[in-house]
Amino acid sequence: VGSEMCIRDRLVPARNFPVEVLFLRDDDIPESVASGVADVGIVGLNEVMEKRCPVGILKKLGFGKCRLSLAIPQNIDYQDRNWFSGKKIATSYPGILSDYLHKNGIVSDIHVITGSVEIAPGIRLADAIFDIVSSGSTLVSNRLKEVETVVESEAVLIGTDSISSEKRGILD
């Protein structure tokens, strides 16, 4: 069974408010705002950082809080971040991870995975992971432990300088 969602299904006018809401995948939002497809967007700070699009953070929204962290198997004796030198790290956030490793003088092999990153060490695909952590329960259930927090994230409202004053007034 298949279906195709068209733009009509994703673009919804608001009632009693002069806006239309466009539903997109979170990783598409920064580029859609940067390119002018959308005036503003609500997305995780982690996606803004990873996509590196020319957008500004208009407001931190105080929900969707999580962190991007490095995690390793629970049975490993971890001393410091130099443990990651020469290791293979699975992630869906290669840009943020690469910046962190470079800043800390660590050379590692980054393996990009788009989902279920937490299983990578268990199936010997990687030595460690770099992924979103909220409660940490997914890490525990996969016998991993969080050892380095790299980014604290939450939902943010993003936009560009090109938004009109009329539209800025609606945001206020």
Predicted regions: what they are:
Residues V1-I7:
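Short, small-residue-biased leader/transition segments that mark boundaries at the very start
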Residues R8-E31, D109-P121:
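Short helix-initiation/N-cap motifs at beta->coil->alpha
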Residues L11-A14, A120-P121, F130-L144:
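Ligand-binding pocket segment of bilobal, Venus flytrap-like solute-binding proteins
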Residues L22, A38-G44, D127-V133:
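Paired acidic/hydrophobic, glycine-rich loop segments that form the ligand-binding mouth/hinge
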Residues D27-S32, V37-C53:
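Pocket-flanking alpha-helical
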Residues L45, P54-V107, S164:
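A conserved helix-loop-strand patch within extracytoplasmic ligand-binding domains
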Residues L45-N46, V133-G136, G159-D161:
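Short secondary-structure boundary segments
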Residues E50-K60, S137-E152:
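Ligand-binding "clamshell"
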